[in-house]
């Protein structure tokens, strides 16, 4: 008996929809819970509230104490935008050197860089803290921004090296014959053609910096310097009195830049991941 493909595809789509709903349900619950009154968030089992209210957003945006949540939001945007631009620029420069230029010890340095991918971030956390403390950078944004100038993110360098190696070298030779310098080749040929990988780097840098809590907790100790993850922590009280409603509301607000950035750059993001062969 011949198997009916309709039922096969129907069952497959049902399973995919069920898995998709299971993955997106926590976000849906977070969004709807942010519109519930504080005393029914955990007692009301329904997904949609009976009474919709914006009080959580108003109270959450007012922040904790004298510091408004807008301060945390702007601090995060400032750090993320600078890190995104600087990291993509200097990571692409470093990747161009590894992929196109010939210099002594290139393979050795590239191998050493790849080895650093195996090191947990916590291994270098204490040495970095000691160095930044010697520089007087504690409670400043410098520990997050300055290291990006040195192309120290091995993951993004490796991603861009893979992309640049896939580009034909004939264009480099033609530009060199026309008198273009090595930096000119990078600026006029390699960088424009590598925009999918550059945008992928920018997107990942923004998301990882925006979500970073551990590093920001170590280096920032003044509420006026707090970022969004640190600001959300202020809604939780160790005594048991926590402002869940405002925290959920500000969590929804904190997701907006990530959603906007991802969906606006989704085409380049998918192209960069597919071309470099990197899987999430």
Residue ranges and their predicted role:
Residues 2-280:
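A structural signal for multi-pass alpha-helical bundles of membrane permease subunits
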């Amino acid at each position: 008996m011949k198997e009916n493909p309709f039922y096969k595809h129907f069952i497959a789509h049902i399973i995919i929809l069920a898995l998709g709903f299971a993955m997106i349900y926590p976000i849906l619950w977070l969004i709807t819970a942010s519109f519930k009154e504080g005393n029914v968030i955990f007692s009301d089992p329904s997904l949609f509230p009976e009474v919709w209210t914006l009080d959580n957003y108003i109270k959450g945006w007012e922040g904790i104490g004298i510091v408004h949540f807008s301060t945390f939001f702007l601090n995060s945007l400032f750090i993320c935008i600078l890190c995104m631009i600087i990291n993509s620029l200097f990571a692409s420069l470093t990747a161009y050197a590894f992929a196109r230029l010939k210099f002594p010890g290139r393979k050795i340095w590239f191998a050493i860089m790849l080895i650093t991918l195996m090191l947990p971030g916590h291994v270098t956390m204490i040495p970095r803290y000691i160095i930044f403390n010697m520089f007087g950078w504690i409670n400043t944004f410098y520990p997050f921004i300055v290291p990006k100038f040195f192309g120290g993110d091995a993951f993004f360098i490796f991603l861009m090296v893979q992309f640049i190696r896939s580009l034909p070298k004939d264009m480099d030779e033609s530009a060199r014959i026309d008198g273009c310098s090595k930096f000119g080749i990078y600026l006029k040929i390699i960088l424009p053609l590598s925009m999918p990988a550059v945008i992928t780097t920018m997107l990942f840098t923004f998301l990882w910096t925006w979500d970073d809590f551990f590093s920001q907790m170590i280096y920032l100790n003044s509420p006026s310097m707090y970022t969004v993850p640190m600001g959300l922590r202020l809604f939780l009280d160790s005594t048991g009195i926590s402002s869940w409603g405002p925290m959920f509301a500000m969590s929804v607000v904190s997701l907006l830049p990530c959603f906007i950035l991802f969906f606006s750059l989704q085409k380049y993001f998918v192209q960069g991941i597919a071309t470099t062969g990197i899987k999430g």
